[in-house]
Amino acid sequence: MNTYLLEYKHILTPKKGFSKLFRDYTSESSERSELIAACFHLDYQKEADYYRQLGLLGSRTFERESLVRLLSRQNTRYGATALHLREIEKLRSPRCMAIVTGQQLGLFTGPIYTIYKALTAIIFAKRQKALFPEYDFVPIFWLEGEDHDYDESAQTAIFSENQVVHFKEEPYRRLPNQMVANSCFGEEISRTVEEYLRLLPETTYKKEVSEMLREFYYPGNTFEMSFACTMMRLFREQPLILLSSQDPDFKQLSSRIFLRELSSSPASSYNVVAQSSCLENLGYTAQTKPRTVNLFHVNHLGQRQKIEHPSEDSFSILPDKQRYSKHQFLELCQDHPEQFSPNVVLRPIIQDFVLPTFACIAGPGEISYLAQYRKNYEHFGISMPFIIPRGSFTLVEPKISRIMDKLLQVIGKPGVSRKQIYHAVFGDLQQLKKNAVGVTENPQLETLFEETKTEIRRALAALGPLLSKIDPTLEPLLAASTVQSAKIIENIEQKTWKASRRKHEELLEQILKAETALFPDGLPQERLINIFYFLNKYGTELIDTLKNLLNGHATEAHIIVEL
């Protein structure tokens, strides 16, 4: 199994790849230093900050007993083993810290980076234990089920016959803006599972995959239970703890932040706007737009409703605009915190208030919006944890590896390595196609065409002054001839390209197969393709393989794995 590391700054081929902020955050540059200083509290590349974070967390108090009871109850329900319950028990000690990651619920666990996040949290916790043996570090996976964007959660994709096939589970008796977690599956889920399995090739691992999906995805089960039980089964031999934030007991632990948000509104929004301005001054784009109140109200049907703050002394709940005095609303929140749900601005604050978060494992998009929250963390009186980039992979199947072999043969020069071919594929695939086709066998032909066009323009331009003296009416004819000559050369160039393309049609088709496999729908593979496509082919031990690979590398680089 071959692996290659690519720096994020070189990955430019996907339509929606890695943002400038993320590329700077994972680099070693002056831009990174400025970004860290302005937008974060800790730098994961600085050893001194690790001791500082231990001290910061050690000085805070957490509701550890309540947290252990909550997590034990939840994880037992999801199918936890004795290993998971032992990990949870460690949280009773003030010398136990959490390595937190999480993801929006997804169909059959959603895109494969969900798995990469969990693996990164497990590996990072293990590394910190090795560095600080007197402490414990437990990986916690936050189940983001309070989101009401059902359409985003209810889809996934796999490869089938060199094409990307999408699956989407239609909602069953679902109300508008209802939280995804408690959305139930109808009869349609059984048909979706069977169609998904039908498109997976027959392998020695298909029986295990089929049994798992049928066991957890069935009519009447909720989205969160299906997702959580699947994750627990996949990580049954790993010390990963799952956390559902929609639990009423967790809401009780979060209530102080809810009350602070309401009583100080719109302060947190002003903080995000101010931090966003700082971010934009550094040349980055702000991802998140805060609301006046960064909480939703949750009604008895599980629908998230926007909260407005029309005056200093009142709140209202949309869409009915039910009005409360400030005192009434704060009292409602204190008595019934389960009726409130944080939005994207407040969610990380809740996380790091309730949990002893030593580090948060985040993806490129999350790191971008967390860069907007520094002032808000300070507003709520807590420090930001370490923000660690999640592990990032592209899995290359043998048939795609063979295409890389062919590319190396066709365009490789003495000293060109396989890694450089991947650099070319991930850096500028369109240019690689041109190089592969070669515009015939003459690599200088493109330059010659450009030189020819330039020389013709120059020669015709030199005629201009003389023709003007002879007869000014000749000038338009000269101008038209200049345009026409350029078109003639371009026509010859296009025909040459087409002739060369026909000659290399087979290679271009293979490159297209590789493009589909590496950048399905123009996206990084990890953001679209589902883990069970690969588990069906390579078995659940693939998760252990990826964990071992991640253990051997830092997460500041993208890892290409030839399976």
From Swiss-Prot:
Record gene name: bshC
Coiled-coil zones: 498-518
Source species taxonomy: Bacteria, Pseudomonadati, Chlorobiota, Chlorobiia, Chlorobiales
Native organism: Pelodictyon phaeoclathratiforme (strain DSM 5477 / BU-1)
UniProt KW keywords: Coiled coil, Ligase
GO molecular function: ligase activity
Keyword Ligase: yes
Matching InterPro entries: Bacillithiol_biosynth_BshC (IPR011199), CC_BshC (IPR055399), Rossmann-like_BshC (IPR055398)
EC number assigned by the record: 6.-.-.-
Sequence similarity: Belongs to the BshC family.
Name by which UniProt lists this protein: Putative cysteine ligase BshC
